[in-house]
Amino acid sequence: MVSSAAMARSNGDKPSTSSMEEDLEIEQSMRNASIIDHQYEKEENKNHRVLNAFDPADKTTFSDMIHVDVPDTKTLVERSDGITKYTAYNIHINGWYHGSVRFSHLYEFAELIKQKFSQRYKGPEFPAKKLFKLDPKAIDERRQKITKYFQALVQHPEVARHYLVEKKLLGFQIDSFRATSQYVTLDVFLGNGEKTTIKCLVSDSTLEIMKIICEKLGFKNKDQFIYHFGLFMAKGRDPTNACYSVTTENFNPLLTRFLRNFEAPFVSLSTANQKYNENGHYHFLCLRKLIWDSRVEEPLLDDGNFVELLYKQAMQDYKNGHMDPVKEDLDSKLKSCMARNDSKMFLRTCHQLSTYSYEIMSPCSCDYPKPGTPCEIKFGRRQIIMTTRDETGKPKPSIFRATRIRVWRITQVMDKISFQFEYLMAKDTFEWITLDTDQSILMSLLLQSIGSEILYEHNNMTIEQQVMKEKHSKGNYVEKSEKLPRDPKKPIIVLKNEVEDTDPLGVMEHYHNYNRMLTTISDGIPQRNQAFTDITNDDL
């Protein structure tokens, strides 16, 4: 018997939507859905490599996701004499180069963690010091051990979410950057491409930069501002047009990175432009809203500062065609509002558009309705919209609601990164959807932001309560799910929590019952969507 999901794939239909009666059945199905243990191949398989990931909570906004890797090393020269050489280990976080750190500094960090957390940590030990100089083979073995140590360390909320880890990661980045000046200026672009320049320290973290921006723009409530907006790294959307400067005329950002508090935006931006610019496509910083439902945005329209900032982004999205198609009557109304600069009415008109408030991702390949299907992706309105084309070239949008996504994860086959989520296609029918994209980590963070907004709303929490809850949060709980079938001939890297079975810190039982508001996003293991179990009939 062919399942409804399989028929949907073969016929290219949209994911099922539900009537009011079906909603009740689906809700019951979702609440009773069991999570199957995720079985992974053994590490003896030479074609298989296991990576780790973790999400520590940002102390003021949404959960961070940290995936740490130490892929290689480099030889550096001592600053003191300019002659003596030493080996530095290149640390990458969330797929981006973070810094090059010498062994002694990493060892000091490990000793600090051991002292702070006493005997509770029983994961992989940090490699010991050696009396003699290491040969290349020994250096690589040490690198692998350092990688395993960090990947195990960040799996444990009590450790990874501690301010010491955040502070040390920030310090590694800053020390590695070797800035020539302590005080700098930083350009941040608002939603319409308008540039605001702030003065800051090279070492200022993302949170500090957000506070400076908040003050510069005249917002009185820092918590509310930081909760509703995020600092992103972006580049020009048109790959054929080199972008050496950003103006209000050419502003059409393609987000590449959601900056978190373990990094300094000035350093992250400078490093990205040193290492990753191609054909004149330089990265820049921009402020984007993190609001996924018009009902959340509506109360903000009583504050003139929020209205102005939201209007700038909405107007630019409209000009760039990101709200198309727009009905003729609403289109005329939007143009009229723009002509008389009626920002509040413009936003309220946007709230009537189903195409408003989306972040447009890069085109990618997906396996829905069949493998290798080109698609366009956008995140917003508490859902993911994938637009494919039929044989005649006609666009066919498929809508995936956030409340129907049970788990999501990131995997890697060879050099190909994929974002995968398990979706409730029909009653008791779940199916994995795979997107092959280099924006996988960004998509995970956006989906987490959407889930957090849903949970906050269901908990009837004020912004102040939400922020305080996150500030005092001590951990997340991650559940497992079934693994995806794969071609056995292809080596696959599944980002997995290696220590989840042993729980060296003995804290996971406590976190299982902790407030599920702070769901972990993990590119390491399948992530259970807590909004999935807290939904109401209106969400289905």
UniProtKB/Swiss-Prot annotation:
This protein's GO CC annotations: cytoplasmic vesicle membrane; early endosome
Name the domain of life this protein comes from.
Answer: Eukaryota
Which function does this protein serve? Critical regulator of endosomal recycling of numerous receptors, channels, and other transmembrane proteins. Interacts with membranes containing phosphatidylinositol 3-phosphate (PtdIns(3P)).
SUPFAM superfamilies tied to this protein: PX domain
Its protein name is: Sorting nexin-17 homolog
Q: Where is the PX domain?
A: 67-176
Q: Indicate the principal place this protein occupies in or around the cell.
A: cytoplasm
Please give one Gene Ontology molecular function term for this protein.
Answer: phosphatidylinositol binding
Read off the Pfam families from this record: PX, SNX17-27-31_F1_FERM, SNX17_FERM_C
Compartments, as annotated in UniProt: Cytoplasm; Early endosome; Cytoplasmic vesicle membrane
> In which residues is a 1,2-diacyl-sn-glycero-3-phospho-(1D-myo-inositol-3-phosphate) bound?
102, 104, 129, 142
Tell me where the signal peptide lies. none
**UniProt xrefs under PANTHER family:** LD15323P, SORTING NEXIN 17 AND 27
Q: What keywords are assigned to this protein?
A: Cytoplasm, Cytoplasmic vesicle, Endosome, Lipid-binding, Membrane, Protein transport, Transport
Swiss-Prot/TrEMBL domain comment: The PX domain mediates specific binding to phosphatidylinositol 3-phosphate (PtdIns(P3)).
Annotated region (Disordered), positions in chain? 1-24
Family named by the database record? Belongs to the sorting nexin family.
**Is Secreted a UniProt keyword of this protein?**
no
Keyword presence, Protein transport = yes
Single Gene Ontology BP annotation: endocytic recycling
Question: Which species?
Answer: Caenorhabditis elegans
As for membrane topology, the entry says: Peripheral membrane protein
